[in-house]
Design a protein with these regions (language model features):
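Short, small-residue alpha-helix embedded
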Residues: 34, 157-158, 216-240
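Conserved N-terminal subdomain of the carbohydrate kinase-like
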Residues: 14-21, 41-124
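Conserved phosphate/ATP/ADP-binding segment of small-molecule kinases
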Residues: 132-206
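Phosphate-handling active-site elements
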Residues: 43-48, 233-247
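Single conserved hydrophobic/aromatic residue that forms the stacking wall/gate
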Residues: 1-13
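Charged C-terminal helix
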Residues: 67, 242-280
């Protein structure tokens, strides 16, 4: 915060804490950078973005992906950090090995306090968003520098090679990911049967978060949303356990208030709180 005070921006910082997402664009607005920015705003931080790829997608699927060049990605990161240093950073879709290396090398120069890595691999509709040859760089370079990694069950299975069918399996896989170097791992159990169970694992911490499973079809962008919600709460000064708990509550209510948009799997309602106040 001294950085802001030295530039005469102390009061601005208190009003709007800057947060950054580095991820792909979703043309339908439900996931990716669009979901991240909506989440940052809903929670009360100032959202900034670095686009890594442009996707042509809607509620029915992903139809095309075009990566941006490493040079423009690096330039975006530099432009943000050199002017508005983010209090926390979330990294989502990074599809190629070259892009991962470019991002890692650039981010290292700035060493953000909180780096949340959401290891996006496959879209909800089944479209592969991470090239097979990029997985090695994700594991070798990006995950080790993270403050928190937020894999779902299929992603954790891909990273660890462990088949996950229970909370015990989630713990084993999470501990294996923790060995790669991040400070914390949040294993998201939404793909398992029963209640929605997430497991937070770190040094001297093992906490199981349980919430009711909602019978809603509109869940497009839930993974992006919870990881960016955690990023925003960390930026606001909450500790890791509080950040996860508050973000679980936020995503649960956003799903509860989700609405039909398009012909497929619709988005969650990022601004449900404002809708409720408007109705009142």
């Amino acid at each position: 915060r001294d950085y802001y005070a030295s530039r005469g921006l102390g009061d601005v910082y208190k009003r709007q804490v800057p947060t950054l997402t580095i991820a792909g664009s979703d043309s339908s607005g439900g996931a990716g950078v669009q979901a991240d920015l909506k989440t940052f705003s809903a929670i009360g931080t100032y959202g900034m973005s670095v686009i890594t790829a442009v996707t042509a997608q809607n509620t029915e699927g992903v139809f095309a992906v075009e990566e941006l060049s490493g040079e423009i990605i690096k330039s975006q990161i530099k432009a943000v950090f050199d002017d508005i240093e983010p209090a926390a950073v979330k990294i989502g879709m990074v599809s190629s090995p070259e892009i991962i290396v470019d991002i890692v090398n650039t981010i290292k120069k700035y060493n953000p306090s909180f780096l949340v890595v959401d290891p996006v691999m496959i879209s909800k509709s089944g479209y592969s968003l991470l090239k097979p040859e990029a997985k090695e760089n994700l594991i070798k370079y990006l995950i080790p520098m993270a403050y928190l990694v937020t894999p779902n069950v299929p992603e954790a299975e891909e990273i660890t090679g462990i088949k996950i069918n229970s909370v015990t399996d989630m713990k084993l896989a999470g501990e294996k990911i923790l060995e790669l170097g991040p400070k914390f791992v949040l294993m998201k159990g939404g793909h398992l049967d029963g209640d929605a169970v997430d497991v937070l694992i770190g040094e001297n911490i093992f906490h199981v978060f349980k919430s009711k499973r909602l019978n809603r079809k509109n869940t497009h962008g839930t993974g992006c949303t919870i990881s960016s919600a955690i990023t925003a709460h960390l930026a606001l000064g909450y500790d890791i356990k509080e950040s996860v708990a508050l973000s679980k509550k936020y995503i649960t209510e956003a799903i509860e208030h989700s609405f039909d948009m398009g012909h497929g799997v619709g988005p969650v309602h990022h601004f449900y709180k404002f809708e409720e106040s408007k109705i009142k």
